[in-house]
């Protein structure tokens, strides 16, 4: 039996940011390597400031790595970030959800913005809501979710 195709390959990813107040740089992501198989569920867990959001933004093609190579669905993220953005989405809880809209309304808004066909939304929403354990909160305003 062969292994499932790889959805993500990260090879020795590094990212630094300049701290304006000090003029020094700080390491946000240091030497991260991983492979995620298609169809698998993977979680990034770590304390505040560990680089989780930075790594996700690089994977989604919203930010470039300083070093290393990222490949998403066979696409070199550095070479063609728009192709990655056309295939995947990144929606953070903070600054990504409209707090006055319900969870369902936020899903519909982002699906509209990314051109997700109506025919596949129901199945996709069900999977996302199950993965995030938010199915029972679809009518709740995003600003009233725990952690919001």
Model-based region annotation:
Residues 108, 112, 119-137:
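Conserved ABC ATPase "signature" region
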Residues 68-79, 83-84:
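Conserved ABC transporter NBD signature motif
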